[in-house]
């Protein structure tokens, strides 16, 4: 009996599951998939990740979306603008990010970045005071951004 091995099987066996889950969260938020974002948040926290880490990862992604959007607005072809991502996008994520670029205007990205930046400043201030940004607050911020993608 021979079984077919899929790319998902390989990812599950070899991939860094925390980065896969973080990518799942980033893509769910940026695509406006609120339920999927909520599930990814649950998986991240169950795996020991802090949502402050997730906020930073989502912010970095939106910064690159902002850069790519600016390149596209100045006449750079979308495929070339996608090469601005560092590290380079995995081939499976390219279509997802292409969809994100269609969903997010420069202005919407700037609003999301302002919210993410403020939440990171608040988290740093709370950490300096010996407390942490409540996980629920960080999760609500990410879900709020996911809902904004739908508008």
Segments from the language model and where they lie:
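Short, flexible active-site recognition loops that position polar ligands and cofactors
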Residues: 102-106, 122-132
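Small-residue-rich helix-loop
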Residues: 2-111, 150
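Charged/polar positions within long, soluble alpha-helices
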Residues: 67-70, 121-128, 147-150
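Amphipathic alpha-helical regulatory segments at dimerization interfaces
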Residues: 43-44, 122, 144
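Short helix/strand-capping connector loops at secondary-structure junctions
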Residues: 97, 114-127
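Charged, amphipathic alpha-helical oligomerization/scaffolding segments
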Residues: 57, 111, 115-118, 141-144
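Acidic, carboxylate-rich catalytic segments that either coordinate divalent cations
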Residues: 129-151
């Amino acid at each position: 009996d021979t079984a077919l091995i899929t790319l998902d099987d390989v990812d599950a066996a070899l991939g860094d599951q925390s980065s896969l889950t973080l990518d799942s969260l980033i893509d769910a938020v940026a695509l406006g998939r609120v339920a999927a974002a909520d599930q990814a948040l649950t998986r991240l926290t169950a795996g020991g990740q802090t949502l402050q880490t997730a906020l930073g990862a989502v912010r970095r992604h939106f910064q690159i979306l902002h850069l790519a959007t600016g390149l596209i607005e100045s006449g750079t072809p979308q495929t070339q603008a996608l090469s601005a991502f560092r590290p380079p996008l995995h081939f499976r994520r390219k279509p997802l990010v292409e969809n994100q670029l269609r969903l997010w205007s420069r202005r919407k990205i700037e609003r999301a970045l302002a919210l993410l930046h403020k939440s990171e400043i608040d988290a740093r201030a709370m950490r300096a005071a010996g407390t942490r940004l409540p996980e629920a607050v960080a999760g609500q911020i990410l879900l709020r951004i996911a809902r904004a993608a739908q508008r």
